[in-house]
């Protein structure tokens, strides 16, 4: 192939013609087709973060709790007593849109490899899923496929799926989001990194044989979805959880035996990405012999060997002098183990095939993709929606019926039909089962501690105000951890956005990153890593439809004593309900802006996103933790989608008890805003000793309100005298509305 024809075909490699010219200029000669394909993969958004990395400078990434920050396979935080938690979230959006079962399954497999590549034993998975219209046959196909894929891989490998979130909105109709978060435990001394070490070190391929599945996956995930994407099924990998289990055990045994100097998962862009990233971290060069790569298909050529994304494969670099011991250990697990190359004292990435050099590129060139800082401009339509006057929105006549309607919305309704497909008790570390509390809680065996994890984002907030919406996602994650008794430690993020070449999309990305950064600083939760998934949009007629911007936040925290925790279910009649974060000087929730209620009942996505007071957010976290750790409450629940009334109903449904609540809001507050508005930094707790709880909150300077009490009668009663509201709905009706919707979608 001539140099001109390569330039003409730059787009097939994932490069613009300008990027191709830059590549040639930096290389100082014309590349061959393999070299162009390798650079295309490494400069893709999926691998090179060329539209997003310049924004990451805003993130706080350090702190005394951070053992490993961004740049490795996963972040690691210190939880005390010599223990660390490795955690990370990644997306498998495009593959899941094309082949939902394998797309989701391999998403689980890939994130688990990132965790055990750090020397940590995976012990939990959470998934954050976004789908389109729940009544659509395509949505039902995608939901069932994705859930089956996650269940298949997680259940088979023996790692519990312990939590997550599921959202339904038309913007995800053709482009679902599958974000998977994994956590693993490790001793500090077992922390591993992805480096080549020193000159002379061997490069060892271990795991499954290489096939043609996943070819072009990195480039496929860095472009818009279209009707032609359905033909890209070969770009979707095929997973084998039983092979991954062998690879997991072998890798951890090798690390703990002190045989490994460096370890890296083969993920996006396969063999190339994993090895050139390791070389770049070490500031060294490598030479590899592609003839030695184990294959499962006949006639594979260098481009396929380099860019295949076949699953369950790792690169290990032995400690010098322990090469044979490593080979013997890995062979015991019946894995393919082959030395395919060596670390050398130069700066080149060299590949040979049949005795000839077929690739010779600077390591830095591969790893330093061009970076773009684009101009972001807010969409005029979105600004108009945010500034819309909502005073004319009619007040529903039957607010009890509205509560039932909100509880039956698939985004709010019970996710039991989903999580009951997952084995959430395998490994026997799960202390709080999915749906029982605002975050997952896992025990650390041999220690009194527990680890909590959550994933959160309200895409509607981010659509209307990306800065406030992203900051709100961080604050909500922190509240959710506090509601189980965990101190928030750090986050991983999964930034899902549309095409960054569109100014209105780049604006959303810019603003969301800044919102995350500011919230993380305020709440002392550094960013330890994450994932960016752009080009999440599809064509509908003559229009490009982007997803709602979805910066999903995965957050971990620690419980000093896992037996001192809280859940959301009401536990006894006669307890007092307190609303933490209620600001008497500012009144009750006084807006229906950006609420699930406004969208569901009135068909509007409009209005101001409730402002995020980060000082109050920290006080609510501190106050919730203080009450739980003082033994003053074991019941706590965050107010989120659906507002105060939905949160109270969820607590009653979970506990099988009723409640009587009276809200003393002034007459100027709309009844629907009072019940269903989504003001931030609010947590409901149930306490036996209201005086002691109040004294503790006063000591902390945290505002609160007394809502009412729990009762035996199976009925939720909410009165608001100034609004002439007296809502009373029996528990059975609430429970039916909440439990049934997803049963009709799954099956």
UniProtKB/Swiss-Prot annotation:
It catalyses: N(2)-formyl-N(1)-(5-phospho-beta-D-ribosyl)glycinamide + L-glutamine + ATP + H2O = 2-formamido-N(1)-(5-O-phospho-beta-D-ribosyl)acetamidine + L-glutamate + ADP + phosphate + H(+). Mg(2+) 2 binds at residues 114, 265. It is found in: Cytoplasm. GO terms for molecular function: ATP binding; magnesium ion binding; phosphoribosylformylglycinamidine synthase activity. Its EC number is 6.3.5.3. Mg(2+) 1 binds at residues 90, 531. ATP binds at residues 49, 88, 493, 530. It is an enzyme of class 6 (ligase). Pathway: Purine metabolism; IMP biosynthesis via de novo pathway; 5-amino-1-(5-phospho-D-ribosyl)imidazole from N(2)-formyl-N(1)-(5-phospho-D-ribosyl)glycinamide: step 1/2. It comes from the Bacteria. The active site is at residues 46, 92. Belongs to the FGAMS family. Part of the phosphoribosylformylglycinamidine synthase complex involved in the purines biosynthetic pathway. Catalyzes the ATP-dependent conversion of formylglycinamide ribonucleotide (FGAR) and glutamine to yield formylglycinamidine ribonucleotide (FGAM) and glutamate. The FGAM synthase complex is composed of three subunits. PurQ produces an ammonia molecule by converting glutamine to glutamate. PurL transfers the ammonia molecule to FGAR to form FGAM in an ATP-dependent manner. Monomer. Part of the FGAM synthase complex composed of 1 PurL, 1 PurQ and 2 PurS subunits. This is Phosphoribosylformylglycinamidine synthase subunit PurL. It comes from Deinococcus radiodurans (strain ATCC 13939 / DSM 20539 / JCM 16871 / CCUG 27074 / LMG 4051 / NBRC 15346 / NCIMB 9279 / VKM B-1422 / R1). The lineage of its organism: Bacteria, Thermotogati, Deinococcota, Deinococci, Deinococcales.
């Amino acid at each position: 192939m001539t140099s001109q024809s390569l330039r003409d075909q730059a787009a097939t490699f994932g490069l613009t013609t300008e990027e191709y010219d830059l590549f040639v200029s930096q290389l100082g000669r014309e590349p061959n087709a393999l070299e162009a394909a390798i650079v295309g993969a490494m400069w893709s958004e999926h691998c090179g973060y060329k539209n997003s990395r310049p924004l990451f400078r805003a993130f706080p990434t350090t702190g005394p709790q951070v053992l490993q920050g961004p740049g490795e396979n996963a972040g690691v935080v210190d939880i005390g007593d010599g223990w660390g938690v490795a955690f990370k979230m990644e997306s498998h959006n495009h593959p899941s849109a094309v082949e939902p079962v394998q797309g989701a399954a391999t998403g689980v497999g890939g994130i688990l490899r990132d965790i055990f590549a750090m020397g940590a034993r995976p012990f939990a998975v959470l998934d954050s899923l976004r789908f389109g219209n729940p009544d659509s046959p395509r949505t039902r196909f995608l939901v069932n496929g994705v859930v089956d894929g996650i269940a298949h891989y997680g259940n088979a490998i023996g790692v519990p799926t312990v939590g997550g979130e599921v959202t339904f909105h038309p913007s995800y109709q053709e482009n679902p989001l599958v974000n998977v978060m994994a956590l693993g435990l490790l001793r500090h001394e077992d922390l591993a990194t992805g480096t080549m070490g020193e000159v002379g070190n061997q490069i060892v391929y271990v795991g499954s044989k290489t096939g043609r599945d996943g070819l072009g996956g990195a480039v496929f995930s860095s472009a818009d979805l279209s009707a032609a994407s359905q033909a890209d099924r070969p770009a979707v990998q095929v997973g084998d959880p039983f092979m991954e289990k062998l690879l997991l055990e072998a890798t951890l045994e090798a690390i703990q035996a002190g045989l490994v100097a460096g370890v890296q998962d083969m993920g996006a862009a396969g063999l190339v990405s994993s090895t050139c990233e390791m070389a770049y971290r070490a500031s060294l060069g490598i030479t590899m012999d592609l003839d030695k790569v184990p294959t499962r298909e006949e006639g594979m050529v260098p481009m396929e060997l380099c860019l295949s994304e076949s699953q369950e494969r790792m690169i290990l670099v032995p400690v010098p002098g322990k090469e044979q011991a490593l080979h013997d250990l890995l062979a015991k697990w019946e894995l393919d183990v082959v030395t395919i190359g060596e670390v050398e004292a130069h700066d080149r990435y060299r590949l040979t095939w049949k005795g000839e050099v077929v690739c010779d590129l600077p390591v830095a060139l591969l790893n330093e993709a061009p970076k773009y800082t684009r101009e972001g401009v807010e969409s005029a339509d979105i600004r108009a929606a945010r500034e819309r006057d909502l005073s004319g929105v009619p007040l529903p006549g039957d607010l009890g019926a509205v509560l039932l309607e909100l509880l039956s919305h698939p985004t709010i309704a019970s996710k039991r039909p989903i999580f009951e497909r997952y084995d959430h008790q395998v490994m026997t570390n799960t202390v709080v089962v999915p749906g029982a509390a605002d975050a997952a809680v896992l025990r650390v065996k041999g220690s009194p501690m527990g680890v909590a994890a959550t994933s959160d984002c309200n895409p509607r907030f981010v659509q209307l105000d990306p800065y406030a919406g992203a900051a709100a996602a961080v604050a909500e994650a922190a509240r959710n951890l506090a509601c189980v008794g965990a101190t928030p430690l750090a986050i991983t993020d999964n930034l899902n956005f549309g095409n960054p070449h569109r100014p209105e999309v780049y604006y959303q990305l810019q603003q969301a990153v800044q919102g995350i950064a500011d919230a993380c600083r305020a709440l002392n939760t550094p960013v330890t890593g994450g994932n960016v998934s752009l080009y999440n949009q599809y064509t509908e007629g003559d229009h490009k439809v982007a997803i709602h911007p979805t910066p999903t936040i995965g957050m971990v925290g620690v419980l000093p004593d896992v037996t001192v925790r809280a859940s959301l279910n009401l536990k006894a009649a006669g307890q007092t309900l307190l609303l933490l974060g209620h600001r008497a000087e500012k009144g009750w929730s006084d807006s229906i802006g950006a609420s699930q209620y406004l969208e569901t009942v009135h068909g509007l996505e409009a209005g101001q996103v409730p402002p995020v007071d980060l000082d109050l957010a920290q006080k609510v976290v501190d106050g919730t933790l203080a009450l739980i750790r003082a033994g003053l409450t074991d019941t706590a629940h965050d107010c989120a989608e659906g507002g105060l009334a939905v949160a109270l109903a969820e607590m009653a449904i979970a506990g099988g008890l009723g409640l009587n609540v009276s809200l003393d809001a002034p007459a100027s507050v709309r009844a629907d805003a009072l019940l269903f508005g989504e003001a931030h930094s609010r947590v409901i707790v149930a306490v036996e000793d209201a005086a002691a709880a109040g004294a503790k909150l006063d000591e902390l300077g945290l505002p609160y309100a007394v809502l009412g009490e729990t009762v035996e009668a199976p009925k939720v009663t909410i009165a608001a005298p100034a609004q002439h509201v007296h809502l009373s709905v029996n528990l059975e009706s609430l429970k039916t509305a909440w439990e049934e919707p997803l049963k009709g979608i799954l099956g």
